[in-house]
Amino acid sequence: MIIERIRLRNFLSHSDSDIYFDTGINMIIGQNGAGKSSIVDAIRFALFSDKRTRRTEDMIKKGERYMEVELYFRSEGHSYRIRRTIERRGKSISTDAEIERDGSIITRGASDVSNYVEKNVLNINKDVFLTSIFVRQGEMDALVSKDPAERKKILDEILNIDRLEAGYLLLKEVIDDLTANVSDYDYLKNELQSKINEIDNNNKQIEELESKLRLIEPEIKALEEEINIKENKKDHLNEELHRLNAQLETIKKYEMELAESQSRKASIEMEVVKLPSIEEELKRLENNAAVVKRNEIIEYINLKKDLGSLSEIIEGLKSDLSKYDEAHRKLEDLQSFRSEFLEKKKRKEDLDKLRSSLKEDEDNYQSAVRNIENIKKWIENEEKEIERMSAFISEILKIQEITPEIINSRRAEINSSLMQIEGKIASLNASIDAMRSHKMEVEENAAMLSGRGVCPVCGTHLGTEKSEDLVKHYGEEASRLEEDINKTENEIKKLDEERKHQKKLLDRINGKDVERLIASYNLLSSKRAELKKFMDDEARLKEAHLKAEAAISQYNSIDLGDLEAKNEEWLKANAVISSIDIENIRSRFEEKNKQLNDIIKRMNEIEVNIPDVESYNENSLKRIDEELNSLRNKKNELYAKKAAMDEIQKTIEHFKEEISKKKGIEDSQAEVNAQLLQINDDLKQLSSRLDKINVDQYEWKSLHKVLLQDNEKLNIAVADIRKRLEKKETIIKAIADLKRVREAFSKDGVPAIIRKSASEFITNQTRQYIQRFELDIDDVDVDQDFNITVFRGGIAEGIDSLSGGERMAVAFALRVAIAQFLNKDVSLLVMDEPTAFLDEDRRSDLANIIEYSLKDSSGIPQVIMISHHRELLSASDLALEVKKRNGSSIVDVIR
């Protein structure tokens, strides 16, 4: 993996830093707090979303809402770009990420990108990668300066052996928890056997009950069949008894109907004896003249009615003829008045049409006249009010001329001025924050240096004079910053006063008085346009107005008073004539007179034939008809009763024959009842026996069901216990496996293997690097407990026997060897403050070691170092310097 470029926007102290790296030694130097380590933090953040801050949003530069990091690197022939962002959105935080390979997006999302980097790009565990390529501050010195126990602890942490030992302790807790979980294993086995024994006992009882139930089934079946036979016979006897009872009921009915029929026959015989007298009276009435000459009498009555109706019609026709003659004379007398009326009415209607056609224009004209007068008055009043308000507002705003355009222009100027002031204040506040932050860093550094003479970051001895110069420099820098802060705060106060003044002016311009004035101007302009429209309408409609006035004058001069009354009389006379069809009336008058004469002639003929015809009327004829019909109906009724009496006699004979069978039916009924009594006794005995057997069967079946249900529950319990036992057995097996795994995690297990492998590899790699350094050391050995032994002239010596430079060389070789052990293909090494706690000579030695061992070497293609000491610049291929300017970190290429 080779890092080519990293871009930081609003990341920690970096506003916008775009940093390019190269192969070889990349040195990043700068004062404490300049933002050097932020670059390393950004690399870790881009790769794995790692952060050193407590909260994610704390990585966003103070005063900003958005942060972005872009990392460009090469790995295994591919070019990659990772982009991560954090954004404040109100109270929430939004994060995003994406990874691009050879120009194509591979995946998005913070966790997905991290997983892809670990599994598809680096192909090693994140922790192993970070441990192998990132050398922490003071880590190299600790490898040779600490005592053996502490050195072993440091190496265990680097190689993750400490995690195996922690796993060894954790596995004991897990095993103890699992052992407690299987403490009831024997109890469950005993409980299982108890349940199985209970099921076996239940099964024995079930077999006995099933045997009893099988034996009792044939007896129940035989009893049920015998009962069914008896029940069927009982049903047949009941049917026969029902039939006999029905026959007896029918005979009882016949006995009652016989008495009734005999009574009816006697009653009819008493009525039939009246038949001869009724026939004689009917014959006498049928020979009466009112019956024999009935049609002529009815004709005479109808002609008499028609005679009266014709007389009324003829009188009406005479009246219509008289009305017609009188109306005709009146029409001739009024004709001249009628003609004069129509002529004047036509003239008046024409004038009215003209007036109606001009009505809309006349109404519009009158409306325009009224509106002109009203608007002129309104404009006059509004101009006075605008003049008054303009004088008042002009005095307040200090503007000579007041118009809506001038007011809006002034408002825009004030808003623009306010925005500029707000921007300046925000910028100055940000500058104050940056200066205060810088001042705090300077004061902290001065406080840490004062009286100690040691660099607070790396522990370098500065000497009294250099320390005092640096403290003095920090004091001067703090004073200058305080002075700049005060000046900036005064500038902010002036800007704030101006802002208040401009806001006051804006409030006045946005006030109700100004708004009313603008509204009045706009309304006045609208009213003036409206006035012009109405004045144009008045001029356009003037001619129509004059025509309308002339038409109204002529219309009012025409008087139809007397002529209208004469015309009404003419219309009434004409209506009478129009309503009378004179020719039809004259024709009908002649026709009705002829009909009248014909009726009188026919009535005279009937009176000659029937002298007493006048004595008859409709009521007398009706009475005769009613009497005649009554006699005829009685005659027919008596003949019908005589025929019915013969039928009744036949029915009486039939009833007597059926009643004679009653004795035989009653004997059969008694015999059937006796048989039913015997069958009921038999059924009672059989049912009693069956009920007793059924009770036994029900009790056995109930017990059988209870035992089956009990077995079902027991089987469920057995299955549950077996499952629990299987789980327990799995756990017991797991405990045994975990014990074996824990044994592997013990100090004599995997950790010992790793230490052995690591010690061999680290010894070989360290030996190779030591040989390059051309030191007075023949060999070096690192044992499994990470004790370091060096050899001079074949004599073994401890690490403490080495000079400062030699110790630094061994420490550097060890750390590079460890990195290569963790990651065989390590192509990048990032060292954060490797000079920490080193004196000037040892820093110089480290520079030489780096130059001889890493520069232009194919072992580790790229090294990135962070330091605030410039002694290492000589060993670099690319040098970058980080400085703080106005609270932001700036990165410059210096070599």
Swiss-Prot record:
Necessary cofactors: Zn(2+)
Residues reported in the UniProt entry to bind Zn(2+): 455, 458
Residues the record lists as binding ATP: 32-38, 137
Keyword Coiled coil carried by entry: yes
Cofactor binding: number and manner: Binds 1 zinc ion per homodimer.
Keyword entries, A-Z: ATP-binding, Coiled coil, DNA damage, DNA repair, Hydrolase, Metal-binding, Nucleotide-binding, Zinc
A single GO molecular function term of this UniProt record: zinc ion binding
Annotated coiled-coil segments of the chain: 183-253, 464-510, 618-647
Family: Belongs to the SMC family. RAD50 subfamily.
NCBIfam families, A to Z: PRK01156.1 (NF002244)
Subunit structure: Homodimer. Forms a heterotetramer composed of two Mre11 subunits and two Rad50 subunits.
Function, as annotated: Part of the Rad50/Mre11 complex, which is involved in the early steps of DNA double-strand break (DSB) repair. The complex may facilitate opening of the processed DNA ends to aid in the recruitment of HerA and NurA. Rad50 controls the balance between DNA end bridging and DNA resection via ATP-dependent structural rearrangements of the Rad50/Mre11 complex.
Protein name: DNA double-strand break repair Rad50 ATPase
Organism from which the protein derives: Thermoplasma volcanium (strain ATCC 51530 / DSM 4299 / JCM 9571 / NBRC 15438 / GSS1)
Taxonomic lineage of the native organism: Archaea, Methanobacteriati, Thermoplasmatota, Thermoplasmata, Thermoplasmatales
